[in-house]
Amino acid sequence: MAEVSLKILKKHNLEHISELRIDPEILLQRFSPGCSMCHCNGTCCAEGVLLDLKDKERILAHADLIKQYLDPQQEHDVQKWFDHNIEYDIDFPSGQCDGTAVRDGGCVFLDSKGLCALQKTALAEGMDKFALKPFYCVAFPLVIDGHMLTTDDPEFTNRSQCCSIVPDGSITVLDVCREEFEYILGAEGLEEIEKVFKEEVASPVESAV
């Protein structure tokens, strides 16, 4: 099998990564018409998420505000919001990450209506809706793995209750996750990856698998 030449993105919002590689598989994945993150009923918030220590610090700095928007039964002790298990990881700006805790079958910030308390707080207080959310919460189902942009597979791509890859699919990951791509890459980076996807449609890359 011929070696696949990896596409490199130089326009993006990740200051700790100079050249962001694109996983060839995300150029090949196709989904059914109508698949959309807006319609997603997946279970990503049933688990915690890894977050950069700076994201953690920002959440703790707004702890008193966030508590006002928690359900009564949600955890109000800030010391129990995180795993306190620091790991070293090159895909996080600080090089270190922690994880949000899981309580009652979901992320500690997931309320009884399936809403994120962090996003709920930000919207109610006039902030950008993503101001308090960890990077990988907003980016999901896109992830950075070894400075490579890819999808959280099989978490995203093979869900029986959500979007799944199909052989005769007509829409791409970019179609499904445009807002998430723009969050990671910025407006210029979005234009750059749009060109990459258009090139793939014109001349499909060979699967790396």
What are these regions (language model features)?
Residues 1-209:
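Short loop/turn segments that flank or connect secondary-structure elements
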